[in-house]
Amino acid sequence: MILTVQNLSVTYGTKKAIDNISFSIEPGEVIGLLGANGAGKSSAIMAVLGIEKSNYEELTMLGKSPILDRKEVFQEVGVQFQETNFQDKLTILEACEQWESLYKQTADVPLLLQTFGLVGKETQLVKSLSGGERQRLSVLLALISNPKLVFLDELTTGLDTKARRMLWKQLLAMKEKGLAIVLTSHYMDEVEALCNKILILKEGKTVFHGTIQEAIHASEKATLEDAYLHYAGEEDWI
């Protein structure tokens, strides 16, 4: 397994933000971590990354502890957050060079720039980029270490339909080569395009874990979106 999470919990004071969640992924798999705002998605990812304090039965990445073997593990794990902050006077190329300096081995940066449609923009200041370009850059940087596992938080927020589909195509090609992905998203078409399985959280607890077809079948709904709304407890808002 690339990632194994067994009975992980996060507590803030007396409140359990995450309550005994478990999941695992193998090379070439994508799991979608879904839930309404406040369901615990961010807390879960932060705990798995070792940023948030947590209790767990097992937590391993690439067969090692992301907490005890942190430096070694994160040479092969990429992370993209929804809000990536860049220095105001940094160019795209300088941002890539900064990220490259953190790793012993890196991917082919010119190829990544081409893949993500940023060729010819290398000398542009990051602050001058459009929202979609900044999002593509943040995903590129998460992949610069040529990782075996990457965490993508709200992957295509702010992107138009064409840019979203372009990014899906690129990630599917990387998935075929063995890249494992943990993805959070509010877009069910994105989840259907990318994910092998999903885990839906409600108030920090797992309310569904399985494949998309299993979610649709078990909920007795016609679509993934309807199944998601059912499990996440958002049907009452419609």
Residue positions per predicted region:
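Conserved ABC transporter NBD signature motif
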Residues: E57-L68, E72-V73
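Conserved ABC ATPase "signature" region
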Residues: E97, S101, T106-K121
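Conserved ABC ATPase signature
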Residues: L125-L129
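Catalytic Walker B motif of ABC-type/P-loop ATPase nucleotide-binding domains
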Residues: V150-D153
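A short, surface-exposed alpha-helical micro-motif characterized by mixed small hydrophobic
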Residues: V191-A193
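ABC ATPase "signature
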Residues: H209-G210
